[in-house]
Amino acid sequence: MHIIMKTILATLCLILCASCCSKGACETRIKHTFSEKKFQKYSPVPKHPLSEQTHLYAKSCSIELEQTQLPTSTLTRYVSSTPTDSLSSKPLAAVYVLSHPLIQHKASLLRNKNTKSKIFRECLKEISLGVCYEATRDLALKNISIQTPLMQAECPHLTGTKIVVIPVLRAGLGMVDGFLALVPNAKVGLIGMSRNHETFQPSSYCCKLPEDIADCHVFIVDPMLATGGSASATIQLVKEHGAKNITLLNVLAVPEGIERIQKDHPDVTIYVASLDEKLNESAYILPGLGDAGDRLCGTSNPS
């Protein structure tokens, strides 16, 4: 019992520390539209309980991001190669960008090519905890009666929503411990995706999912959202097994990957720690952090 109490208190301290350090930071909710060629200023979306919202501007398939606390280059303007009339007409899912100073600091440590695997793993775990914290803030609660050491009290308690975290192998494994630190009772699935380095097309080589996944809130974790091909294929595979409530958690993403997920799966919400500029000719994120799987496992030069 003492061990459990210590674990809970340690987790709460981490959350309180993160909340205190987020003063003055900002979060952005992104929505795409692909209609007018003129810039259109959107009214702030309903306030998400983290901090102040920013304004979003969209131009056809291009988007520009303005933030009060961060440089405007957080998300660069881009033009999609996808024809406007072929994009989904359904409402596009929200994308939440975390701009917490501690997360941004640790993301910079991940980017540094001189960061060793041990520190890389620790930072990835800590960032994942922060992203999980934001992604789970809408979980349903109900009041239950409990006996404290002093009195009987009605206290909020999770309603019993089943949660599954699914890492995309192998880099996604580095995000699991951070997620489980906050949601220790979550089930863990596994999906392995490999990418053809010439065509950049994904293929699945492993799929181990809970039998009751249709009744679960599924959180897919993968550090990198580059072309979006692997993430889209993973989401599709999970849906084929019956999952309906899916959230995607990433550390780094680029506009191309976000657009791909919003086009293929407009019902999936994305939480990302940091937005990068673009992809290079090899479909690697720039400035990025290199190959997250290699750096996590120490299997190659991080450059």
Swiss-Prot record:
Annotated spans, Unknown: 1-86
Residues reported to bind uracil: 285, 290-292
Cofactor-binding details, from the entry: Binds 1 Mg(2+) ion per subunit. The magnesium is bound as Mg-PRPP.
Stated role: Catalyzes the conversion of uracil and 5-phospho-alpha-D-ribose 1-diphosphate (PRPP) to UMP and diphosphate.
GO terms classed as biological process: UMP salvage; uracil salvage
Name this polypeptide is given: Uracil phosphoribosyltransferase
A Pfam family annotated for this UniProt entry: UPRTase
Recorded GO MF terms: GTP binding; magnesium ion binding; uracil phosphoribosyltransferase activity
PANTHER family, per database record: ADENINE PHOSPHORIBOSYLTRANSFERASE, URACIL PHOSPHORIBOSYLTRANSFERASE, CHLOROPLASTIC
InterPro entries: PRibTrfase_dom, PRTase-like, Upp_B, UPRTase/APRTase, Ura_phspho_trans
Regulation of protein activity: Allosterically activated by GTP.
Residues where 5-phospho-alpha-D-ribose 1-diphosphate binds: 170, 195, 222-230, 291
Chain's gene name: upp
Catalytic function, reaction form: UMP + diphosphate = 5-phospho-alpha-D-ribose 1-diphosphate + uracil
The entry's keywords: Allosteric enzyme, Glycosyltransferase, GTP-binding, Magnesium, Nucleotide-binding, Transferase
Names of the cofactor(s): Mg(2+)
